[in-house]
């Protein structure tokens, strides 16, 4: 079994970045879409940013861990989102 923190670092710096590009840009684009959706759907004034997205994506992974027995990948992803939050956003 590989070291989780090493796997997290590889995931956010290589694997996911190669697929999805720079997380700062990606999270800010997601924030724009989610902001538009929430404003339209619920008629609320809200402005999400990349930091909000990192937190909410981590919360999504935590929710999955509650209902799934095999959750190593969710742990890696949750730590990855929080690492991006702490280091890049």
Where in the sequence are the language-model features?
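Intrinsically disordered, low-complexity regulatory regions
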Residues: 1-89
């Amino acid at each position: 079994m590989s070291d989780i923190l090493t796997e997290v670092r590889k995931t956010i710096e290589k694997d996911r970045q190669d697929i999805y590009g720079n997380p700062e840009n990606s999270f800010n684009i997601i924030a724009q879409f989610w902001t538009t959706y929430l404003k339209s759907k619920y008629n609320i004034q809200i402005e999400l940013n990349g930091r909000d997205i990192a937190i909410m994506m981590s919360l999504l992974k935590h929710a999955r861990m509650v209902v799934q027995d095999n959750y190593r990948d969710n742990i890696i992803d949750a730590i990855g989102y929080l690492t991006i939050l702490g280091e890049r956003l």
